[in-house]
């Protein structure tokens, strides 16, 4: 054991953590100290071989160690020991071959910064919703505006028909109009007596125009037929 390492082991307030295994030669006579307060440890040695336990011990030692405190880890796998020290927060320094893994607690805290939030108040961020509306937004829509736009291109000379996969509402509108006409025709009374005979015998104002012949008193029902 080098003189420098021997001097380290003679430090006062030395924290020693072992897993109960055989101690490294030269450390068996070291008396460990009991930690009562966080941040009071200046020097520590760790002799733990199990990887998961070593990680937990390194984290604990980091928490109780003073700023610029120094810890030595005696391990058969220095690469793993260095990694566990770094993960715990220690700054690892490479030493001579006869030295164990060495870590120094070096944590820098930045200065406090005061945030300038200004004098803005919550009321200044609120927007009057009514102020976003225009005059035309208050106008009540007409019946034509509420009707479905229809399928296909606009053609003033042709009546719009709902397409097969209509999703604009025109198909429902046509169905409602059709059912209204059927209900109106069912409630109508014949004035000429020829309504049940068919279009060839019906007058120009007959409510049954376009419907098939039927028996007098029979309710006229049209089957839903797809034109496409």
Swiss-Prot record:
Protein name in UniProt: Anamorsin homolog
Region of interest (Disordered), ranges: 138-159
Linker as annotated region, ranges: 110-138
UniProt comment concerning the protein's domains: The C-terminal domain binds 2 Fe-S clusters but is otherwise mostly in an intrinsically disordered conformation. The N-terminal domain has structural similarity with S-adenosyl-L-methionine-dependent methyltransferases, but does not bind S-adenosyl-L-methionine. It is required for correct assembly of the 2 Fe-S clusters.
Complex formation: Monomer.
Organism: Caenorhabditis briggsae
InterPro entries: Anamorsin (IPR007785), CIAPIN1 (IPR046408)
Tree of life domain: Eukaryota
Compartmental location: Cytoplasm; Mitochondrion intermembrane space
Protein's GO biological process: iron-sulfur cluster assembly
Region span, Fe-S binding site A: 151-168
Physiological role: Component of the cytosolic iron-sulfur (Fe-S) protein assembly (CIA) machinery. Required for the maturation of extramitochondrial Fe-S proteins. Part of an electron transfer chain functioning in an early step of cytosolic Fe-S biogenesis, facilitating the de novo assembly of a [4Fe-4S] cluster on the cytosolic Fe-S scaffold complex. Electrons are transferred from NADPH via a FAD- and FMN-containing diflavin oxidoreductase.
């Amino acid at each position: 054991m080098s003189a420098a390492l021997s001097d380290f082991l003679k430090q006062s307030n030395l924290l020693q953590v072992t897993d109960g295994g055989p101690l490294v030669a030269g450390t068996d006579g070291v008396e460990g100290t009991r930690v009562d307060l966080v941040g009071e440890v200046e020097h520590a040695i760790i002799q733990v071989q199990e990887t998961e336990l070593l990680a937990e011990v390194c984290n604990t030692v980091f928490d109780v160690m003073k700023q610029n405190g120094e810890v030595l880890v005696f391990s058969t796998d220095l690469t793993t020991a260095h990694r566990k020290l770094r993960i715990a927060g220690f700054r690892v320094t490479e030493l001579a071959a006869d030295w164990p893994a060495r870590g120094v607690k070096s944590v820098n805290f930045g200065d406090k910064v005061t945030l300038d939030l200004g004098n803005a108040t919550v009321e200044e961020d609120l927007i009057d919703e009514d102020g976003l509306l225009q005059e035309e937004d208050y106008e009540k829509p007409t019946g034509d505006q509420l009707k479905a736009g229809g399928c296909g291109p606009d053609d003033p000379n042709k009546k719009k028909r709902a397409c097969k996969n209509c999703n604009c509402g025109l198909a429902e509108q046509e169905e409602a109009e059709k059912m209204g006409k059927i209900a109106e025709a069912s409630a109508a009374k014949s004035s000429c007596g020829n309504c049940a005979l068919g279009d060839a015998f019906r007058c120009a104002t007959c409510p049954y125009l376009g419907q098939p012949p039927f028996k007098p008193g029979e309710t006229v029902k049209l089957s839903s037929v797809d034109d496409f």
